Amino acid sequence: MWFMYLLSWLSLFIQVAFITLAVAAGLYYLAELIEEYTVATSRIIKYMIWFSTAVLIGLYVFERFPTSMIGVGLFTNLVYFGLLQTFPFIMLTSPNFILSCGLVVVNHYLAFQFFAEEYYPFSEVLAYFTFCLWIIPFAFFVSLSAGENVLPSTMQPGDDVVSNYFTKGKRGKRLGILVVFSFIKEAILPSRQKIY
């Protein structure tokens, strides 16, 4: 009896490890796609914001969700549209980004408060959290590194495009989520180096 119990915990550990690696690989691939197709990503995020807005309005009209929760959700979507204006360049210190992070916390608080008082099946609660609270911040999070590989578009007075690109515009290291995933990939599966 104890042997089967031990095997069940071991199998659970292996399954969690495989799921974690699969999610990391998927996020890495998604971040690569976002870096490659920033214009399409911006358009997709815009459509996701519109969809989330329609869902919030539908929840207010058909399900009679509280006005405060829907209002904060709609205001959050408006702030997301503001973040989309400078996409793929998202400054982590901009007031718009800080406000969106704060509104995510407020939205979660209001949602937890509402669903603690009103009973809804778990699948419906998960649907609300997915479409109204998680999908858009997740899209912005995955696309944080998308602005690093875009060609330089602004110059300082006295600089020409070529020298700006090769000196000041060039970074020694990449930053963002892709660096983290690359580090994890190299730590788990080190690449072979050719020896001549």
From Swiss-Prot:
Gene Ontology molecular function, alphabetical: COPII receptor activity
What keywords are annotated for this sequence in UniProt? Answer: Membrane, Transmembrane, Transmembrane helix
Bilayer-crossing residues are 3-23, 42-62, 70-90, 97-117, 125-145
Gene Ontology cellular-component terms listed: COPII-coated ER to Golgi transport vesicle; endoplasmic reticulum membrane; Golgi membrane
Which family is annotated? Belongs to the SVP26 family.
Matching PANTHER family, A to Z?
PROTEIN TEX261, TEX261 PROTEIN
- Identify this protein by name: Protein TEX261
Q: Could you tell me the gene encoding this protein? A: TEX261
